[in-house]
Regions:
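Sensory/regulatory domains in signal-transduction proteins
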Residues: 2-137
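Juxtadomain coupling helices with adjacent low-complexity linkers
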Residues: 112-176
């Protein structure tokens, strides 16, 4: 669950066009096996240097670890994950996206990788999620190790979703 530390983040925000789709496929370890032009354009990467790289090359440090734990736990169960993700472009800029990530299966039903489609997110939802993620990050920073950080951050996310009376996926879909 490492973050992209080789790029210096900036305050430059990129906005996805309403009809833009960012599509990637990864193997079981999260290494990119396919990236569409939309992904390459918004992340400011080229295909040659992107394929086989870990998908976390676009991970923004403002993303709580607990969100990625939830993502991986959901996918490993064979379930579909929805999330609002702040990604980082190769120049340090960022963009918010509504992500739908699903397992990919072979003919025998075995998970062989993951398929991600991201699109522009609702601004109202981004503002809510931004505040929630900031609270989660603060909780993570107060812990002495990743395990405790994820537990503290997950509790905040769980408490928020319990207040809403729905799961994380259901909450996000309600804004779609």
């Amino acid at each position: 669950m490492s973050r992209n530390t080789s790029v210096i983040q900036t305050s430059k925000e990129y906005t996805l066009k309403t009809n833009a789709l960012i599509v990637t496929k990864t193997d079981l370890k999260g290494h990119i096996t396919y990236a569409n032009e939309g992904f390459l354009n918004i992340s400011l990467l080229d295909e040659k240097n992107t394929l086989t790289q870990s998908h976390n090359i676009i991970r923004h440090p403002d993303m709580p670890k607990a969100v990625f734990r939830l993502l991986w736990d959901t996918l490993k169960k064979g379930d579909e994950f929805f999330g609002v993700i702040k990604n980082m472009s190769s120049d340090g800029g960022y963009y918010w996206a509504f992500a739908n990530i699903t397992p990919s299966y072979d003919n025998s039903g075995k998970i062989i990788g993951y398929f991600s489609v991201q699109r522009a997110s609702n601004n109202e939802l981004i503002n809510i999620i931004k505040n929630l993620y900031q609270e989660m990050l603060q909780a993570e920073k107060q812990q002495s190790n990743d395990k405790l950080a994820i537990e503290a951050s997950s509790k905040i996310l769980t408490d928020f979703m319990n207040e809403q009376g729905v799961s994380y996926n259901e909450y996000l879909i309600s804004f779609a």
